[in-house]
């Protein structure tokens, strides 16, 4: 829009939002409306350059030619000034489209430790907190709200206005690869924490200082057949052998009550329920019948990424996740998603398909308008038309601010969960003990004791490990930790031998509920963590910080117990080694 063009009603901030929406909607072509319905990935960099590695067109093409205005920012951000300058460049390009509709930028979580292009980015310059499982281990809704408020400020500083989270799936199937992003197994705890999460990001109501939230994955991922993930065809079935479908809705009801602005359905298809056996975003009974009509959700529904177009991610061929409807062509997939009641297509850039559906009379323009209204309304409410740009020079003073970093580091320490502590091994009180370390940076450990190479000469061994998993092939698929939760037998033998030679503190990072039966009786202390630095771990070991964590899920005793459990039922493995809520503590200080 030319700066010399007379002011248009949709540009007038004094008018009611609904009036501005209707004015702008009435000026839009079908192609412009279609562009609104797509949100895909974009990576910081020159906006006129494509990203073939991720199969992405350039920002210039998507904004200028495809008329898109919603993008999911990929990757860790080491330089927040550069990130803010890049978001401003996108907004400047959007300002030169016919109607000057500003861009809405979104992100997966980027304030934790996980780095997976499909689910989260490592914190980088942002404050670093425990994973959401760690927040659940602490169990304080006030802390979760403070976390979300901190992240809100960091997002705003670089122009990110939509959080593709929280993830409130319930960890009732211990093998599932996405547990690390949840609040654990308990529906009531998840419901309590998600309310604080949404308050912290959005405030009492959505406005210019808010970051909108997209709660996922409706109606609750987690009960996956054999724990396999529906990003992939072999994991497409979502099962309810315990007839416990409604249990998984509890956190979503809480999110809606807290004002959740957006909702994302999961990839899976329900099997053996009253609902049609097609993926949730294609499922009219789930989106319109359950989410819209029964639960009363009036916000934006955006599909999970990649339901329409076959693509390649990180060199791995990825078929469209049109589970139960794989036989449909792309045009019919788009039609079914719109008929189901979704507003936006995640991970897709195919507005021409919507235009074709309207031209063929298969989808009415009124139906498109209903979704565009919701999407435009949020842009207006967030104040993007008044202030699309950020102060790039100020970004680095807000992102990673000292008090934000300190709060994240304190939460890391509090989230550590002590499972066993034989003869009060913890905290280690010996001055400058000899330390044998595995999985711990020796340079960091050297500040706490003398690091030695031979366990036999050590006073204590400190070992940090990841939850076991069965590696999968492929660039993208390999990033999802699935399969067995057992520590391999040879590793159990090695750890037991180490623990026999020297008192051993074993810290297991739990992105899934590991089976620790083979080592629990051998180590001097067993600790669970959910995203914590080596310094945080050592502070807990040496009593300089107080561990406050309680398990956010049961830890099963065996894989046989996992395999025999019902995927949709919490606390269902027989005779678990440790129960939900277990955690020991001890006084801090020297």
Spans of features found by a protein language model:
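A glycine-rich phosphate-binding loop feature that marks nucleotide/adenosyl-phosphate handling sites
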Residues: 40-41, 109-110, 169-170, 213-221, ...
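A general structural motif
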Residues: 51-52, 242-249, 326, 439, ...
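N-terminal beta-rich core of secreted/periplasmic extracellular enzymes
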Residues: 2-219, 249-266, 279-347, 359, ...
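C-terminal non-catalytic regions of proteins with extracellular/luminal or membrane-system context
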Residues: 1-13, 277, 305, 311, ...
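Binuclear metal-dependent hydrolase catalytic cores centered on His/Asp/Glu-rich metal-binding motifs
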Residues: 218, 225-245
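Long, compositionally biased
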Residues: 57-65, 395-405
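Short acidic, glycine/proline-rich loop/turn micro-motifs
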Residues: 175-179, 226-229, 274-275, 313-315, ...
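Short beta-alpha connecting loops at secondary-structure transitions
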Residues: 234-240, 272-277, 311-342, 352-365, ...
């Amino acid at each position: 829009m030319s700066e010399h063009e007379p002011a248009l009603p949709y540009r007038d901030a004094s008018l009611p939002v609904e009036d501005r929406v209707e004015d702008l909607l009435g000026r839009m072509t079908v192609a412009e409306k279609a562009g609104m319905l797509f949100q895909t990935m974009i990576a910081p960099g020159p906006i006129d350059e494509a990203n073939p590695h991720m199969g992405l067109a350039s920002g210039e093409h998507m904004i200028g030619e495809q008329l898109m205005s919603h993008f999911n920012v990929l990757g860790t951000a080491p330089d927040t000034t550069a990130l803010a300058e890049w978001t401003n460049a996108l907004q400047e390009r959007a300002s030169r489209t016919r109607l000057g509709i500003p861009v809405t930028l979104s992100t997966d979580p980027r304030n934790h430790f996980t780095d997976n292009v499909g689910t989260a980015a490592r914190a980088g310059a942002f404050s670093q907190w425990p994973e959401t499982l760690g927040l659940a281990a602490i169990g304080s809704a006030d802390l979760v709200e403070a976390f979300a408020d901190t992240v809100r400020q960091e997002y705003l500083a670089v122009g990110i206005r939509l959080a593709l989270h929280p993830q409130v799936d319930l960890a009732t199937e211990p093998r599932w690869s996405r547990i690390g992003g949840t609040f654990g197994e308990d529906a009531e705890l998840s419901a309590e924490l998600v309310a604080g999460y949404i308050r912290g990001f959005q405030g009492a109501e959505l406005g210019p200082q808010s970051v909108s939230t997209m709660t996922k994955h409706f109606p609750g991922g987690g009960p996956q057949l054999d724990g396999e993930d529906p990003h992939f065809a072999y994991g497409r079935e979502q099962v309810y052998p315990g007839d416990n479908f409604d249990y998984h809705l509890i956190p979503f009801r809480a999110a809606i009550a807290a004002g959740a602005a957006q909702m994302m359905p999961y990839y899976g298809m329900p099997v053996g329920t009253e609902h049609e056996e097609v993926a949730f975003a294609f499922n009219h009974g789930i989106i319109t019948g359950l989410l819209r009509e029964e639960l009363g959700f009036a916000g934006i529904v955006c599909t999970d990424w990649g339901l329409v177009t076959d693509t390649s991610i990180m060199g791995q061929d990825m078929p469209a996740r049109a589970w139960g409807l794989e036989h449909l062509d792309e045009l019919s997939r788009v039609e079914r998603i719109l008929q189901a009641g979704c507003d936006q297509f995640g991970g897709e850039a195919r507005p021409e398909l919507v235009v074709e559906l309207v031209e063929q009379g298969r989808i009415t323009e009124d139906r498109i308008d209903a979704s565009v209204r919701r999407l435009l309304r949020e842009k207006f409410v967030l104040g993007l038309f008044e202030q699309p740009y950020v102060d790039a020079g100020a970004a680095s003073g807000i992102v990673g601010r000292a008090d934000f970093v300190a709060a994240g580091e304190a939460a890391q320490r509090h989230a550590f969960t002590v499972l066993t502590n034989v003869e009060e091994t913890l905290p280690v009180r010996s001055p400058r003990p000899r330390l044998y370390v595995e999985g711990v940076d020796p340079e960091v450990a050297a500040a706490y004791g003398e690091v030695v190479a031979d366990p036999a000469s050590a006073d204590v061994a400190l070992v940090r490990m990841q939850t076991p998993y069965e590696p999968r092939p492929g660039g993208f698929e390999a990033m999802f930790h699935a399969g067995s939760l057992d520590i391999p037998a040879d590793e159990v033998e090695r750890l037991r031998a180490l623990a026999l030679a020297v008192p051993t503190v074993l810290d297991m990072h739990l992105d899934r509920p590991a089976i620790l039966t083979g080592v629990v009786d051998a180590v001097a202390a067993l600790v669970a963590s959910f995203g914590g630095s080596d310094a945080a771990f050592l502070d807990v070991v040496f009593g300089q910080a107080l561990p406050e964590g309680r398990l956010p899920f049961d830890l099963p005793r065996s894989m046989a117990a996992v395999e025999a459990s019902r995927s949709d039922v919490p606390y269902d493995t027989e005779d678990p080694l440790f129960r939900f809520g277990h955690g020991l503590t001890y006084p801090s200080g020297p």
